């Protein structure tokens, strides 16, 4: 059996073909076996309909071999294969993308068998299968600053993201023209005075969001702190853009904090939302140089560019099932 390196490896086409030839050729669909023995590849455009299979579990010898055998048995033509084994936690991660037309069964059956295989690997294994033909459903929360919202909506409008925006929710009316331009429902939920007013507003927001059954909730500069119960309810599918290079300058006015400290870099962080403010697992970060001559306003202006880019990357990786979390750390399989 051919086994690629476990740490951060990607299986090349030659290795993939070798693995498939070693594994139960009689079970492969005739069209795929014909291409393999004749050294042919399917015609591809780069936007193929794919099934994405992910798995994370305690590491042990033989997992990659079991995955290879499984994919060969179902006729899966591998388009991407990535692995990571964390030597500290002893945890294994993988993401496999296969050509949907090569699989000799329905999507539901493939999903059932993949989960069954994961359960055989161990009771602590987490597995899922997604179909790239099915757009993920998202809800965007925003306040008065619209630069991240404008950027995301432009990318989605041009078909760059596998995401359908169900609605936009805000505690201000300012971004409604953006929603109207793209034909997206806009829910303005004003926050009343005091903690009771805030709690009532969040209850309304929660009802709106949950009614849409979103795969992802994006806080695109939503300048309100989610209550702990919503953080727990939306755990693992709510992502935020914070305007600093975390863990530096958590909380409010990070650019003001950065200016007072005389930093030479400002940054942004895309992370999962948890009840621990600005301390969720980090998905993506980037920085921009600043100098002693930059004012706080200059830092804010430069930071906006980084915020847009970092959120765009982090959201894309989430939508493409490239993000896995274990022990507060993320594994990001490259695009």
Regions found by a protein language model. Give the residues of each.
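Histidine-anchored nucleotide/phosphate-binding helix
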Residues: 146-157
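A conserved regulatory-domain signal marking ACT and ACT-like small-molecule sensing domains
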Residues: 36-136
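Single conserved hydrophobic/aromatic residue that forms the stacking wall/gate
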Residues: 1-16
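Short internal beta-strands
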Residues: 163-174
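Adenosine-nucleotide cofactor-binding segment
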Residues: 180, 184-212
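Cysteine-centered motifs
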Residues: 17-18, 23
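Donor/substrate-binding cores of folate-linked one-carbon enzymes
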Residues: 171-172, 182, 196-200, 215-334
């Amino acid at each position: 059996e051919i086994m690629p390196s476990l740490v951060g490896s990607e299986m090349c086409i030659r290795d993939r073909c070798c693995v498939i030839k070693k594994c139960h050729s009689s079970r492969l669909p005739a069209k795929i076996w014909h291409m393999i023995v004749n050294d042919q590849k399917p015609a591809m455009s780069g936007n193929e309909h794919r099934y994405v299979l992910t798995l994370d579990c305690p590491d042990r010898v033989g997992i990659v071999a079991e995955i290879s055998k499984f994919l060969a048995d179902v006729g899966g033509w591998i388009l991407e294969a990535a692995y990571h084994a964390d030597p500290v936690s002893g945890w294994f991660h993988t993401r496999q993308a296969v050509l949907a037309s090569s699989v000799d069964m329905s999507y539901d059956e493939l999903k059932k068998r993949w989960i069954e295989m994961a359960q055989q690997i161990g009771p602590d294994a987490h597995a899922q299968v997604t179909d790239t033909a099915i757009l993920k459903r998202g809800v965007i929360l925003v306040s008065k600053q619209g630069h991240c919202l404008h950027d995301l909506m432009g990318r989605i409008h041009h078909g760059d993201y596998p995401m359908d925006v169900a609605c936009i929710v805000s505690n201000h009316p300012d971004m409604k023209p953006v929603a109207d331009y793209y034909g997206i429902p806009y829910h303005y939920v004003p926050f009343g005075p005091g903690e009771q007013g805030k709690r009532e507003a969040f209850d309304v927001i929660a009802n709106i969001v949950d009614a849409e059954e979103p795969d992802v909730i994006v806080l695109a500069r939503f300048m309100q702190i989610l209550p702990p119960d919503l953080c727990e309810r939306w755990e693992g599918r709510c992502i935020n853009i914070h305007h600093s290079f975390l863990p530096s300058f958590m909380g409010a006015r990070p650019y003001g904090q950065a200016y007072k400290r005389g930093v030479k870099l400002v940054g942004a962080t895309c992370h999962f939302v948890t009840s621990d403010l600005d301390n969720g697992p980090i998905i993506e970060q980037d920085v921009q140089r600043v100098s002693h001559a930059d004012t706080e306003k200059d830092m804010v202006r430069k930071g906006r560019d980084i915020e847009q880019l970092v959120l765009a990357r982090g959201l894309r990786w989430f939508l493409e099932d490239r993000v896995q979390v274990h022990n507060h750390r993320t594994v990001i399989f490259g695009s």
